[in-house]
């Protein structure tokens, strides 16, 4: 994103008969042209400049696009990701995000995981760039994506980490039957600031007003991308994810993390999920709501790091973020 800063230049003054000849009544002034580069990639919404939280701004500045080949087409799509600062030949850790969210929800936990010696990529790139079993992390609806992927591509997933998992909903339910016009109306309602403020207050415990407003604005940035509405409507009418029948098919060792004060998904479902998975452990985080990796990043980072390194060589891992 570039901005131009032009100093004022005196306009040409025409002679009495408007002959088109310039009359030098004023001294010439030198044109001063400055180009100011934004700290953010040009494809991100300009509203990102208004975000106050330093860690959100820092992570956003690292987002870039890479081509991802499609199996059903000769073309590639450009997918956004945060690339690793360093790349090592080790086990990747892949971070998904929840529904109606973005990779910025990992802004607090990602730096801690990197400090622990973990790297960053994105799940979209597995077949093209990773090509080895990974530890897949899915928060909220991202947990349904993780389970579906682990069951259908077991060769790609070594371990699972599910955070406040939304895995028992029957897809998008009756929303799948909505006429497209009504679906678009509902999607645009999701953009409203009052609704998003309410959702943020439900997701986190006791946020100060200025933090709640800034976090709400961070959570709304993806709405400003031109394809967001179409993609969300397509997801709604597709029926969404319904993975409850797949849970018992998961063979990978799984860590379940849950905020004890989750007001969006009942934490009793954590116990149910633990009982239905073949090989799982469960850890609950006190005084924490629906998004522990934002609210309690140190606790989540510690749990993830210990789980990734358990039963494997203690060393640097690869962390992948989408």
Residue ranges and their predicted role:
Residues 1-93, 115-119, 125-131, 244, ...:
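Alpha/beta-hydrolase fold catalytic core
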Residues 147-190:
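Flexible "cap/lid" loop of the alpha/beta hydrolase fold
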Residues 269-271, 278, 294-310:
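Post-His helix in hydrolase/transferase enzymes
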């Amino acid at each position: 994103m570039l901005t131009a800063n032009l100093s004022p230049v005196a306009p040409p003054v025409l002679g009495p008969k408007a002959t088109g000849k310039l009359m030098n009544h004023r001294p010439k002034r030198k044109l001063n042209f400055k180009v100011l580069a934004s700290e953010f990639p040009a494809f991100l919404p300009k509203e990102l400049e208004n975000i106050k939280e330093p860690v959100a701004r820092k992570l956003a500045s690292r987002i870039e696009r890479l081509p991802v080949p499609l199996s059903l087409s000769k073309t590639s799509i450009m997918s956004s990701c945060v690339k690793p600062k360093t790349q090592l030949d080790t086990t990747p850790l892949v971070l998904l995000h929840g529904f109606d969210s973005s990779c910025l929800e990992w802004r607090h936990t990602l730096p801690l995981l990197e400090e622990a010696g973990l790297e960053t990529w994105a799940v979209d790139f597995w077949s093209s760039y990773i090509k080895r079993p990974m530890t897949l992390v899915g928060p909220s609806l991202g947990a349904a994506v993780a389970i579906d992927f682990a069951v259908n591509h077991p060769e790609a997933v070594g371990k699972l980490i599910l955070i406040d998992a939304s895995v028992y909903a029957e897809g998008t339910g009756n929303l799948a039957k909505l006429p497209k016009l009504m679906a678009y109306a509902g999607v645009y309602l999701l953009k409203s600031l009052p609704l998003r403020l309410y959702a943020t207050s439900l997701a986190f415990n006791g946020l100060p007003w200025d933090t709640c407003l800034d976090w709400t604005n961070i959570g709304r940035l993806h709405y400003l991308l031109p394809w967001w509405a179409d993609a969300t409507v397509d997801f709604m009418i597709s029926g969404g994810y319904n993975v409850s029948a797949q849970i018992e098919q998961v063979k990978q060792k799984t860590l379940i993390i849950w905020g004890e004060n989750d007001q969006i998904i009942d934490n009793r479902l954590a116990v149910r999920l633990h009982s239905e998975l073949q090989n799982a452990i469960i850890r609950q985080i006190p005084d924490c709501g629906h998004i522990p990796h934002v609210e309690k990043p140190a606790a989540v980072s510690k749990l993830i790091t210990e789980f990734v390194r358990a039963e494997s060589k203690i060393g640097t891992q690869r962390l992948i973020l989408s």
